[in-house]
Amino acid sequence: AAHLATPMMHEVERCRLALSRAQSGEAVALVCSGDAGVYGMASPVLELAEDYPDVDVEVIAGATAAQSGSAVLGAPLAHDFAVVSLSDLLTPWEVIERRLAAVASADFCICLYNPRSRKRADRLSRAAKIMLEWKAPDTLCGWVRNIGREGQQSGMCRLSELGEFDADMFTTVFVGNADTKRVAAVWSRRAGIGRFHAKGNDHGAGPGNPDLPLARGR
């Protein structure tokens, strides 16, 4: 089978290539990381599919970084939460600021995608300042880098420290709410159970260990 790839910023080209090959009768899988329907390729390929009426598109669910990163940290998204991308390539920064303020003022747990890049080095610090207008400085935050990949790392900090964290585009950031707390070595929003191990900066979590503490909902 042929493996075809395009560089960053050529997603539409990749979608058209996949649809064109499918139109010619080939069985094609368009692969992206995480869940194709969350900041992924499902949306553009479905829009472009109107130009390829003979192609049937099937979207296969995956695990987005909010889910897989949450499992590493424990259970930070056990209740209502919001996901916000800090990338302004497709969304104006002013819109991102309004959305951050809205979810922070409502005390959602917040998952941040694309927290920083070479061209957007200040986005995470600016986002932290916005959230600090509504959330307490000691709000528990966490981060996971290279989720599920070699070199996976994770850690925790307070919201007052988040703006100084050296994130990158492979990092997913989690910001808790007023109820978020640390349970043993993992953290939870009211309820969750987890297994934790640490070696250096590597952290992991998983279900089903009855010997570890349980954070019970009120």
Locate predicted features:
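Short, glycine/charged-enriched secondary-structure capping and boundary segments
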Residues: A1, A18-S20, S43-E47, V72-A75, ...
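Class I S-adenosyl-L-methionine
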Residues: A1-V57, S68, G163, G194, ...
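Conserved beta-strand scaffold positions in the cores of enzyme catalytic domains, especially
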Residues: H3-A5, V57-V59, V83, C141-W143
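A short acidic, often aromatic-flanked loop/helix-cap motif at beta-alpha or helix-coil junctions
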Residues: M9-R14, A65, L89-T91, G148-G151
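General structural feature for long, well-ordered alpha-helical segments within catalytic domains
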Residues: H10, R14, M41, P92, ...
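A contiguous loop/helix-start segment that scaffolds small-molecule binding in enzyme catalytic cores
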Residues: E26-V28, S105-G217
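Class I SAM-dependent methyltransferase SAM-binding "motif I" and its flanking Rossmann-like core
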Residues: V38-A106
